[in-house]
């Protein structure tokens, strides 16, 4: 079998957005002889997960990339189901189970290099992940940039802003908990597959483990900007409510 059809079939088998023939041809021809198929799959996967779905720069096959149906996305539309699989990317994620004031206090503590454990204030360990342990007197820039609110437990509910290939944006809410969604787990620019049958109610996508498949990935510039501006955005929302 020709290498390009093999590569395309392998990428589609793991639910990635359909790559363009031009992208695959360039990738295969970049070295002579071509790299082994597993290496090509890994490279193509990384590129596809890091691209902007709404401006894919010829990486994706637009003819095989359906958008969210406009009728279902209307705020006054009643419940509907997606008739086909749709790839989207994450623009925002928020834990609705934690108040915005609590999120602000946690982020301000992280900015000071602190985090609370029970009643004890401790220093954030260098390079610690959001749900990782903390240690005294040792913090790092990654902790300050990425550490966020509370651990996403089994009862947490998250709201996301999703974008399709045409740039349409829509809110999505966990109807049932999805382990791979959460602050510190979900990256900005991450790709997700909304499977056919996904319910959309009043313009909001309802996410369940059966219909939402997180694929991973990240658009670095988007994620950095989101993380750095998150504290101010929370303050703006809270401040706006109190000035009305």
State what each model feature region is.
Residues 93, 110-112, 181-185, 217-220:
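A short, polar/proline- and glycine-enriched secondary-structure boundary/capping micro-motif
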């Amino acid at each position: 079998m020709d290498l390009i059809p093999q590569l395309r079939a392998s990428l589609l088998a793991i639910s990635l957005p359909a790559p363009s023939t031009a992208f695959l041809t360039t990738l295969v021809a970049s070295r002579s002889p071509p790299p082994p198929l597993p290496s090509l799959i890994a490279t193509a996967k990384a590129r596809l997960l890091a691209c902007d779905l709404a401006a894919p720069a010829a990486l994706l096959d637009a003819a095989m990339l359906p958008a969210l149906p406009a009728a279902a996305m209307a705020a006054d539309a009643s419940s509907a189901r997606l008739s086909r699989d749709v790839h989207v990317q994450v623009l925002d994620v928020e834990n609705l189970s934690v108040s915005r004031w609590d999120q602000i206090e946690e982020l301000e503590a992280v900015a000071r290099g602190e985090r609370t454990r029970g009643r004890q204030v401790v220093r954030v360990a260098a390079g610690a992940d959001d749900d990782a342990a903390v240690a005294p007197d040792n913090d790092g820039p990654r902790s300050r940039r990425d550490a966020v609110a509370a651990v996403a437990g089994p009862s947490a509910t998250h709201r996301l802003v999703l974008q399709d290939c045409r740039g349409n944006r829509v809110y999505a809410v966990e109807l049932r908990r999805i382990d791979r969604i959460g602050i510190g787990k979900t990256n900005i620019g991450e790709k997700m597959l909304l499977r056919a049958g996904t319910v959309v109610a009043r313009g909001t996508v309802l996410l369940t483990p059966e219909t939402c498949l997180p694929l991973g990935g990240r658009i670095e510039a988007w994620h950095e900007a989101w993380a750095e501006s998150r504290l101010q955005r929370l303050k703006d929302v809270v401040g706006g409510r109190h000035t009305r």
